[in-house]
């Protein structure tokens, strides 16, 4: 009776391990995200106009605040800081990774460089994220990764595009959240 329980326990553990491996494999297979592409330039572009209360100067200051919140070294990102015309531009960077199939270790896939532009007007602002390139000896536009019929296609490209999309979605959500006016609570005692 004890031997049969041990055998059943071993089978359950083995089935659990197999299920875990299938789940892990399924998680590593990423679907190509629905990345926004500008129809004119054919480049990846995240862009939207957001209605937000405040003068252009107030929104400019909120945007600068967001840059210091989001980027580790915002002064290395800025290329244009124009408070008078309500414009901030910069060059952002993000790392991409892949998982080594043999060791299962996360490896460095490269550095993505992109342009970020925030334009501010009375009660609204517009962000634009575009010109995504893999840092290499020459420009390597990541739009190439969207072409699955390319003879050089690599399944890792889907993962890289997913990472870019996820990072840009997080960037946009933190930007829109940080641009909201701060509600000051009245100290009632």
Q: Whereabouts are the PLM-identified features?
A:
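Bacterial Sec-dependent N-terminal signal peptides
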Residues: 1-30
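Ser/Thr-rich, low-complexity intrinsically disordered terminal regions
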Residues: 27-189
């Amino acid at each position: 009776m004890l031997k049969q329980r041990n055998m059943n326990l071993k089978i359950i553990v083995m089935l659990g391990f197999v299920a875990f491996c299938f789940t892990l494999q399924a998680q590593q297979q990423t679907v190509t995200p629905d990345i926004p592409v500008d129809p004119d330039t054919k480049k990846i572009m995240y862009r939207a106009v957001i209605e937000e209360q405040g003068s252009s100067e107030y929104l400019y200051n909120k945007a600068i605040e967001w840059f210091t919140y989001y980027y580790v070294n915002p002064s290395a990102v800025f290329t244009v800081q124009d408070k008078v015309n309500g414009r901030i531009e910069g060059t952002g960077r993000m790392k991409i990774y892949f998982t080594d199939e043999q060791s299962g270790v996360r490896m460095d896939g490269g550095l993505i460089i992109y342009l970020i532009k925030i334009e501010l007007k009375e009660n609204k602002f517009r962000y634009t994220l575009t010109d995504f390139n893999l840092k290499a000896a020459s420009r390597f536009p990541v739009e190439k990764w969207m072409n699955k019929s390319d003879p050089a296609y690599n399944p890792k490209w889907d993962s890289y595009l997913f990472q870019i999309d996820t990072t840009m979605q997080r960037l946009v959500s933190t930007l829109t959240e940080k641009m909201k006016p701060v509600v000051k609570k009245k100290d009632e005692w």
